[in-house]
Amino acid sequence: MALRVVTRALGSLSLTPRIAAVPGPSLLPAAQVTNNVLLQLPSASMLLPSRPLLTSVALSAKFVSWKSRTKYTTMPVKMRKSGGRNHTGRIQVHGIGGGHKQRYRMIDFLRFRPEQESKPGPFEEKVIVVRYDPCRSADIALVAGGNRKRWIIATENMKAGDTILNSDHIGRMAVAAREGDAHPLGALPVGTLINNVESEPGRGAQYIRAAGTCGVLLRKVNGTAIIQLPSKRQMQVLETCTATVGRVSNVDHNKRVIGKAGRNRWLGKRPNSGRWHRKGGWAGRKIRPLPPMKSYVKLPSAAAQN
């Protein structure tokens, strides 16, 4: 131990001789000349580490985010991870960071999107392949119809070679619901299992998109449809909103075993704080009433009716 201390002390000593100040032809006093020479030639021990000046340098203007793309493509698009931070660099979502590099595949959540040159009305598409998507929990399917291809969320039993129907027609009688088809809620029979539900007509699916989830069409009231979400909460939308029949694919997603902490880092999940936290009022079982029904239907007010 003593030998190690002596070795470190000898290593810290500088073996280079100190630079002597040579007085030259100057009108300044000798002491000030010596100080100027020492300031011009600092020793290596006086150089302290400094922070870079360009800490807020702007990103490259050539990089185009996948969110700003206006032309649809089925090819994987390069994606830059945010690490849970916004454009100012502040953390907005904790627990995000790292992970394997991923490429984004643009999903078309608007199932009834006829081509410009096609006839108006229902149209069919054929499933080409069903594959894994690293950016979401559910599997995705590549479908083709007419002169285009697009990615959609796959249902539970969807496989290559299947034919799916996309319709916007609401008839007097309910249609025969077939898994993978997309119909307005007003055309489906009550009790149908649905997924990828729109909140507004033509906006695209926003609800029930995670792996293995499904909702239930409870009832139809005055041109609206009441849906039960996977959280048991009810939602009211117009009957012209489109939904897909069936259950979302990858049903066993919640049964997977991570196995080790490193796999969570592969998936881009950062560890939480190891500090002990006291459990608050959220912990434990309790009798809690269901939240009120969420409605996307703009009902006329009482003042407008009068």
From Swiss-Prot:
InterPro entries assigned: NA-bd_OB-fold (IPR012340), Rib_uL2_dom2 (IPR014722), Ribosomal_uL2 (IPR002171), Ribosomal_uL2_C (IPR022669), Ribosomal_uL2_RNA-bd_dom (IPR022666), Translation_prot_SH3-like_sf (IPR008991)
Transit peptide, UniProt annotation: 1-60
Keyword terms of this UniProt record: Mitochondrion, Ribonucleoprotein, Ribosomal protein, Transit peptide
GO molecular function: RNA binding; structural constituent of ribosome
Localization per Swiss-Prot or TrEMBL: Mitochondrion
Pfam families registered for this protein in UniProt: Ribosomal_L2, Ribosomal_L2_C
Domain of life per record: Eukaryota
GO terms, biological process: mitochondrial translation
Primary subcellular site in the record, as a coarse category: mitochondrion
Gene Ontology cellular component terms for the protein in this record: mitochondrial inner membrane; mitochondrial large ribosomal subunit; nucleoplasm
Family annotation (PANTHER family): LARGE RIBOSOMAL SUBUNIT PROTEIN UL2M, RIBOSOMAL PROTEIN L2
Family from the record: Belongs to the universal ribosomal protein uL2 family.
Subunit note: Component of the mitochondrial ribosome large subunit (39S) which comprises a 16S rRNA and about 50 distinct proteins.
The protein's name in its UniProt record: Large ribosomal subunit protein uL2m
Organism: Bos taurus (Bovine)
